[in-house]
């Protein structure tokens, strides 16, 4: 369902891409989630959000969680909302860098409400 009036005129279409990993996974010497945020910055992508979870269930059925003494198993997500061209550049870069990570890619409408 489209919103009426000026809202729909300013809306853009693209993708919400979310990468799922754990705090202790790395790419090179850097935590993978932080590396993904830096990769987005390097590619000129205007925003990325790194979120930590309390607990998650991995694809292999293993529970991953933070505990009082060890944060290394903490599930983390990096989420970006990008246009189609940015998504293509991002995935090409990840392939070039041989990044191994699970992701979801959803078609979305996005924009900003109000005046800046």
Identify what each model region corresponds to.
Residues 1-116:
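Positively charged, small/polar-rich N-terminal and surface patches that mediate targeting and assembly
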